[in-house]
């Protein structure tokens, strides 16, 4: 039954995507890493261009932190986004030593990857994986390491290259984060998640250290606006844009069965809508002429599904907006090949996309479809789909029942789903939020990257003054009969 439900859902998603607009005209502009145009060699030798530009424009050093906060082949798009961003920054003159990359690194050589050792971020795109440094991979991709890197604290880093943002007062910093998210949290492949209040403390500490002039942050995740809503100060010299507001999904794109579709051998989405929007804009414009404000407007329009929001989200701004007229080269560098570039990228009308959480199911179903009938692998894939769908439904019903036990069967759902007015943070007591999440996970199993969407429910439990003892009692009553198995928090870990 669960598998049939999943099939119907995915069929509906594919059908909706099929009618999503006219065909894109794409003129490839991504070159293989190491493939250099002759004019670039003559004008700005690779490896020295960053220093020369910094000396000329007096902006200090450009630094970047790139984070893919997921793992697994079904999340291919997040690492593809980050690898693509790395290639853009390198072509823009940022030196490898000034770019820190976080990615689990389980995609390029994954057994499911039809092009071993290659990652692409567009249906006609070139490899974006070659040359990307393995700064922090596998178990090293953690919120703790991310904070330490941003603060330039080598002693707090565990494993990895130990590369950190050792920035100075005149330097500019660019951060790009691509992953799943939920109200108040961003995912990490190794728990715990990144919590908004913790991230704000790190940004404030970075500002207090007087080790940068300005910072720009781009975040791709569901409910990513909730990381900054009501929390992001305007006096830190930090400008932020997010793929979505505080209460909606962000969107995957270049997905199987959609238009434009990846090559037929791919069974997963190649990119995320907000992410590819800013990157395809950056690599097809002269970034000494294009401003932060202009890119925001372009990305906002494309990510909104041409202002229809049918298969799109609201790109948001937070923080200090006084320097939106700054040119993008101050943060992303400048590629001489784009000095006289005209916009090579043409996209007319709405394009197909799938929300981040359904993209995971889409991958599982496409994998199932391609396996040989009656094979053990196909049966195993079907069981995984059924297990995943049933666990999602169990999570949803468990959170719902906890709310009903705490607030009454009539009021529970509305209390858990309540959205605070714009300008207010998700929760007043972030430590309470973490406690409530741990109590729930101790008795009902981990939230998983899907269950992150329920963070608002736990925040509202805190906002309504529920005690830890009452939360524990409700969680036990709800989940005492559950057989968690591989979904147990003892196996998966705790997200708080």
From Swiss-Prot:
The keyword Nucleotide-binding does not apply. Residues 23-57 form a propeptide. GO terms for biological process: proteolysis involved in protein catabolic process; vacuolar protein processing. Disulfide bonds join 255-269, 432-462, 444-479. Coiled coil: none annotated. Keywords: Disulfide bond, Glycoprotein, Hydrolase, Protease, Signal, Thiol protease. Residues 1-22 form the signal peptide. The keyword Signal applies. Pfam families: Legum_prodom, Peptidase_C13. One of its GO terms (cellular component) is vacuole. GO terms for molecular function: cysteine-type endopeptidase activity; endopeptidase activity. Its EC number is 3.4.22.-. It comes from the Eukaryota. Glycans are attached at residue 153. The active site is at 180, 222 (nucleophile). Asparaginyl endopeptidase that may act as an activator of REP1. This is Asparaginyl endopeptidase Rep2.
